[in-house]
Amino acid sequence: MLVSRVLSRVSRSAGLRSSFSSVVTPKRNQIPIVASRFHSLVHGTPNKLVAVPVSLRNHGTLDLNVLQRFGFFSSSSAEPKGNESNTEVPKTGETSENVEVGKATDAEIDFDDLSRDDLVKLVSEKEDLLKVQQKDIMEMKDKFLRTYAEQQNLMDRTNRNAESAKKFAVQNFATSLLDVADNLERASSVVKESFSKIDTSKDLAGATPLLKNLLEGVEMTEKQLAEVFRKAGLVKEDPLNEPFNPNRHNAVFQVPDASKPKGTIAHVLKSGYSLYDRVIRPAEVGVTCAVENQEGGKESAA
């Protein structure tokens, strides 16, 4: 392409031939150098285009204006470089894509080249790994269920304890008042028995009405205390003529009584009390015992 441009410019400018011959004729011995340089421009690589004018300038064979006149430094000469550089970029991209495709193909080939034994071994390894993971999942599930059950039991136990603490908060206080209730009961019962024996005709001071009012006041106090106990959940128990229960009764003595079955409560010394079905004081009682054995022993001794 450079040769055609040079020849076209030489043919168009006939006047320049004389100037060119005047420059070239005294130095005929250097024409082979220019020819060889020019030959290197045509058949050489694009990267050597800049080296030619530099070497010519150093040797002084041609003038810079002459070289420019013949198109060695024209702006159009740089276009092939750009085109060539632009054409080289996609080559690099194509090469990288080819490499990636080659790698993927090699991977597929490697996977396809696995033998049947290798595939069976790989599947067995995956199955073993899956079994281990399933076992871990079952263990974690079991731990979760156990922990959840423990938390649920703890919540239920905490609620029961809170409810129990609320119910039995007055237990100690109520226990300390039981003796007061017993004393009021004894006083009312004794005074009532003695009051029936008083002769009102001999009562000159008028103490009988006062004693009667006192008895009524004691009975009212006893009833009021019993009502307070009932509201607080404290219940009085009178187990007379009931079967003896060691969980709720305390046997103090035995009474031989043939009219009642063995183990029946014949006497009550102290009444029992329970707070929401919890016994806070067992009843002190006297229990009947068998009489037949004693009579049989007396007959045998006689």
Curated annotation (Swiss-Prot):
Pfam families: GrpE (PF01025). GO terms for cellular component: mitochondrial matrix; mitochondrion. GO terms for molecular function: adenyl-nucleotide exchange factor activity; ATP binding; copper ion binding; protein homodimerization activity; protein-folding chaperone binding. Keywords: ATP-binding, Chaperone, Copper, Metal-binding, Mitochondrion, Nucleotide-binding, Transit peptide. SUPFAM superfamilies: Coiled-coil domain of nucleotide exchange factor GrpE, Head domain of nucleotide exchange factor GrpE. Induction: By UV-B. CDD domains: GrpE. One of its GO terms (biological process) is response to UV. Residues 1-39 form a transit peptide. PROSITE patterns: GRPE. Its main location: mitochondrion. Residues 77-97 are annotated as: Disordered. It is found in: Mitochondrion matrix. Probable component of the PAM complex, at least composed of SSC1 (mtHsp70), MGE1, TIM44, PAM16/TIM16, PAM17 and PAM18/TIM14. Interacts with SSQ1. Belongs to the GrpE family. PANTHER family: GRPE PROTEIN, GRPE PROTEIN HOMOLOG, MITOCHONDRIAL. Essential component of the PAM complex, a complex required for the translocation of transit peptide-containing proteins from the inner membrane into the mitochondrial matrix in an ATP-dependent manner. Seems to control the nucleotide-dependent binding of mitochondrial HSP70 to substrate proteins. Binds ATP. Interacts with copper ions Cu(2+). This is GrpE protein homolog 1, mitochondrial. It comes from Arabidopsis thaliana. The gene is Mge1.
